[in-house]
């Protein structure tokens, strides 16, 4: 921060030049220092490189504010040019040879240190997440921190077991031979993450690729880049700067990264962007893993526990303000209990507190960006125009990112809120009279991501 930068500047001003060189040399080699001495020099190394070369060791630039590096808003001219991307990729490929030769156990040691770093810095990380996304503190803690730590603990406990060489049966035609399954790194993996879970969707795929022996090119969303956060925890854990490189920027930067022929692309985001990535990757037959959009149905039968179902609908639709690919977006309720369920749901969402908090007092955060807010507004206006009743949230001004839960009754199939992904705090209610009709409504979608059935009859569910 600014105070730390001033302190370093004063220190360097009063120290003799030879001693300054010694300090900078120690900072550059912080990973080789004893455990008690390494952290402050890692911080210094990261800070110096952050100021001089942007926030992670390559000429990655974007026309957005920088808060953490120098304590004031500034701009970096332009986005990453092709030569910078090529140079950074060359360094990733060069570093991969050394990473590949490490044992899984050695890589897991870095995972353990990373988990410890995140635990130590969790309050600061949550602050950065809230500033970037507008999440409630509870959402930031449970979905971003808890989930990430859980994943890292899994890698610590299970990576060696899952990645060790395994003997498998040999077919009779190869009698006399031995067969084994051996897991080999892919090389450099490109991770492109979404704006809705910027920390979790960074650390989880980065570490999954790393523990398998891959270097990682990571591009966060331009909406929630979390400038310097990922770099800080990785450096704190002792990650070599050549193992993971962060590239800031918009879609053009992602396209340049794909052109570098990564070993694999892991993308989470919209269906439209996923199609573009797959089309570009197909030119080189680059393997892709895509996690895209959804219009996830929740089917509630008459024999369901209504209190639990109502709580489940509110949680499923409003966690992360509905900005999740697996959010409940179609609530399909059996006709005989529809009115009771609807009234309970309106009462449930009406007691929830909306806002960005610092003490865990808010139940729902605000929308992350104006782009997605405008989509929710368009869905609301379309539903009202076509006859839907807004039972909660009708007073929203259609502009503020503080969007209240929007409960719809009278939803029909021609409405956007029925067909398109809203990715916001929407709760469209739809009646059904038979099991067959419920299944048909649930499957009446171009998406196929997640769904839930609420009933005491496990056979039917």
Model-identified regions with their sequence ranges:
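ALDH superfamily catalytic-core signature
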Residues: 76, 238, 272-412, 441
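Mature-region segments of soluble proteins
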Residues: 2-72
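Conserved C-terminal structural/oligomerization subdomain of aldehyde/semialdehyde dehydrogenase
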Residues: 77-80, 262, 353, 385, ...
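Residues at or immediately preceding the N-termini of alpha-helices
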Residues: 82-85, 104, 122, 306, ...
């Amino acid at each position: 921060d600014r105070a730390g930068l001033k302190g370093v500047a004063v220190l360097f001003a009063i120290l003799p030049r030879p001693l300054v060189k010694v300090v900078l040399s120690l900072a550059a080699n912080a990973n080789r220092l004893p455990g008690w001495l390494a952290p402050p020099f890692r911080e210094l190394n990261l800070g110096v490189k952050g100021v001089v070369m942007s926030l992670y060791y390559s000429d990655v630039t974007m026309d957005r504010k920088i808060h953490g590096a120098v304590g004031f808003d500034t701009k970096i001219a332009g986005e990453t040019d092709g030569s910078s991307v090529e140079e950074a990729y060359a360094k990733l490929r060069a570093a991969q040879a050394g990473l590949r030769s490490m044992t899984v156990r050695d890589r897991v040691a870095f995972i353990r240190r990373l988990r410890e770093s995140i635990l130590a810095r969790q309050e600061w990380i949550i602050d950065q997440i809230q500033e970037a996304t507008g999440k409630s503190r509870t959402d930031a803690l449970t979905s971003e921190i808890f989930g990430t730590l859980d994943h890292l603990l899994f890698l610590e406990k299970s990576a060696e077991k899952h990645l060790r060489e395994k003997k498998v049966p040999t077919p009779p035609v190869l009698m006399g031979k031995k067969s084994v399954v051996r897991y080999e790194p892919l090389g450099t993996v490109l991770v492109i993450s979404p704006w809705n879970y910027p920390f979790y969707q960074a650390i989880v795929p980065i570490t999954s690729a790393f523990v398998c022996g891959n270097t990682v090119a990571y591009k966060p969303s331009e909406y929630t880049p979390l400038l310097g956060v990922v770099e800080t925890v990785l450096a704190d854990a002792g990650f070599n700067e050549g193992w993971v490189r962060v590239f800031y920027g918009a879609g053009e930067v992602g396209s340049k990264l794909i052109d570098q022929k990564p070993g694999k692309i892991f993308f989470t985001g919209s269906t439209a962007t996923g199609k573009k990535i797959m089309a570009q990757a197909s030119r080189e037959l680059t393997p892709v893993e895509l996690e895209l959009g959804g219009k996830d149905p929740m089917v509630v039968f008459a024999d369901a526990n209504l209190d639990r179902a109502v709580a489940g609908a509110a949680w499923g639709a409003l966690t992360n303000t509905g900005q999740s690919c697996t959010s409940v977006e179609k609530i399909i309720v059996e006709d005989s209990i529809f009115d009771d369920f609807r009234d309970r749901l309106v009462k449930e969402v009406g007691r929830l507190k909306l806002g960005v908090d610092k003490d865990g007092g808010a139940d729902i955060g605000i929308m992350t960006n104006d782009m997605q807010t405008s989509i929710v507004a368009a869905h609301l206006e379309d539903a009202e125009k076509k006859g839907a009743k807004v039972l909660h949230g009708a007073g929203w001004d259609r502009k503020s990112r503080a969007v209240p839960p929007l409960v719809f009754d009278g939803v029909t199939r021609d409405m956007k809120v029925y067909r398109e992904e809203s990715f916001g705090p929407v709760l469209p209610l739809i009646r059904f009279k038979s099991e067959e009709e419920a299944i048909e409504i649930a499957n009446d979608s171009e998406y196929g991501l997640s769904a839930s059935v609420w009933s005491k009859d496990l056979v039917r569910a």
